[in-house]
Amino acid sequence: MLEHERIALSMIAFITGMMAFIESMIAVPAASTAMAADALSFVQHSVSAGFALRAATGFKRHRWTILLQGAVMMVLGALVCLIAARRLVQGSFPHPLTMIIMGFIALSANFSACTILLLSRRQLTGIMSVWRVSRADAVGSISVIAAALAVVATRSNIPDVVIGGAMAGLFVAQGWRILYTGRADANQMR
């Protein structure tokens, strides 16, 4: 593996991993379901970059790691769905200014990761999987900003809960798809 490839993937994994941590820690006091769901997207991006980094070193991804990734995605997505339901019932009001600021910080992290991808596109072997989750991260960050603006406009927590719940639901579905595909692949290899 080339040194610049390892550095690029390491930088992407670090940026997205830090954003996952920061956004998940700020989502709690901000009472934002959309931010919690967006943090999941960054977790997925960091894991994908990590697997691409390992694949570039000749590591063969074992079937159990695929199944584990799918199961973890489903569990985390389900937890955010439960948080959304609880916030809907309790009526906790998110902090829109915090959501907007974090949305723009997350977009800048996405921009940084995409810039690294574009500058390294000829060298990276696992670029397609990392690129797919980069797009999903950007959509998630824009959704956080949109949810914050809708919260301000409606003076309700419903936009944040709906957007965050929908993002988390997609995460559960994606985890299920990974589990299903991973099991099918494992059965074919027997």
Role assignments for model-derived ranges:
Residues 1-190:
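Alpha-helical transmembrane cores and adjacent cytosolic helix/loop segments
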